[in-house]
Curated annotation (Swiss-Prot):
The lineage of its organism: Bacteria, Pseudomonadati, Pseudomonadota, Gammaproteobacteria, Vibrionales. Residues 158-304 form the TRUD domain. Keywords: Isomerase, tRNA processing. This is tRNA pseudouridine synthase D. The active site is at D81 (nucleophile). GO terms for cellular component: cytosol. One of its GO terms (molecular function) is RNA binding. Responsible for synthesis of pseudouridine from uracil-13 in transfer RNAs.
Length: 347
């Protein structure tokens, strides 16, 4: 599989250590956190599943059959990796109060467990989660000491908040199709396909901007015209507040943001605008797709700082525990630590 991110910069240089990722399903564990309580009643049955070696779409389709409903009646907040052990909620539109008998479904699929159920008044929609908790094992690590040094840096500075390879499809196909659609002015009623390509387009331009800041030693430097996050507030950096905002950033109170391109003007100014505009201009096909679909500009933090990061060493294995907000990629953490060893998975 092609690494679409291969050309992008690293925070501390490309890792020298190698390791296997997801050598076993239990080496990549994910627990979804929706961040809200269910109402306890309503037309939607909420089903907490634990799946091993299965993808979310497959489980949702099979759960729909078990409940006697159509696939479109089962929804989720986020897609979870197949090569892993993952816990997440699925919602099933079942207006009747009875909970189906899942015994035949569970007997057919021993790789799927139903942990609990509840009732809610709304179905789950993509993005209806606050984040995920991870337990990741790096196995057969070739240089444990180097990875431990890098972990100290990650704990202090975070990592580039890149969108991972998953966003760009197998071998970057979604990104290539996004460019083709923009270049050829493709119009499609396939909303899911259009959403995938638009997402790939904006994500790639964002990644280029973050990589450039790293290459220019501006990853932790506040620029004139930057947009900074302070909680839910956005601050514009001017000549008058530049020094003060850099101090607040250094103290950990502010976050530098990068562009998620839209058809409206960038809100950045001065030096920050000049840096970002280069990459919008460099991708005319992607921008044609974005503008043609009237996407509005948005912002995203350029640094990803995992919460509750800890690690332990077990021989030549390193076990990582951390939490990420929704929309962030665990692969961005791993990318800064090791080069992945290619191997044939048996699951």
């Amino acid at each position: 599989m092609t690494d679409t991110l291969a050309s992008l910069a690293y925070l501390a240089g490309k890792p020298t250590a190698q390791a296997k990722i997801k050598a076993k399903p239990e080496h990549f564990q994910v627990r979804e956190d929706l961040g809200f309580e269910f109402t306890g009643s309503g037309e939607h049955l909420m089903v907490r599943i634990r799946k091993t070696g299965e993808n979310t779409s497959f489980v949702a389709n099979e759960l729909a059959k078990a409940c006697g409903v159509k696939s479109k009646d089962v929804s989720w907040a986020g897609l979870k990796d197949r090569h892993a052990v993952t816990e997440q909620w699925l919602s099933v539109h079942l207006p009747k109060a009875e909970t189906p008998d899942f015994s035949a479904f569970l007997a057919q699929y021993p790789s799927i467990e139903i942990l609990t159920t509840a009732r809610h008044n709304k179905k789950l929609r993509p993005g209806d989660l606050v984040g995920n908790d991870f337990v990741v094992t790096l196995s057969e690590v070739s240089d444990v000491d180097d990875v431990l040094k890098r972990l100290e840096t990650v704990a202090k500075l975070g990592v580039p908040n890149y969108f991972g390879n998953q966003r760009f499809g197998n071998n970057g196909n979604n990104l290539q199709e996004a460019k083709r659609w923009g270049r050829d002015n493709v119009r499609s009623r396939n909303q899911n396909q259009r959403s995938l390509y638009l997402s790939a387009a904006r994500s790639w331009i964002f990644n280029l901007i973050v990589s450039a800041r790293l290459e220019q030693s501006l990853f932790d430097k506040v620029l004139l015209g930057d947009i900074l996050f302070k909680g839910d507030e956005q601050l514009l950096v001017s000549a008058e507040n530049h020094a003060d905002l850099q101090s607040q950033y250094d103290a950990g109170d502010l976050v530098i943001s990068g562009a998620l391109a839209g058809d409206n003007a960038l809100p950045t100014q001065d030096d920050a605008l000049a840096l970002e505009q280069v990459f919008l201009d460099a991708e005319p096909d992607l921008m044609a797709l974005i503008r043609g679909n009237r996407m509005r500009h948005d912002r995203r933090a350029i640094a990803l700082k995992p919460a509750n990061l800890s690690w332990q060493v077990d021989g030549n294995n390193i076990i990582l525990t951390f939490s990420l907000d929704a929309g962030s990629f665990a692969t961005s953490i791993i990318r800064e630590l090791v080069q992945e060893i290619a191997f044939e998975r048996e699951f």
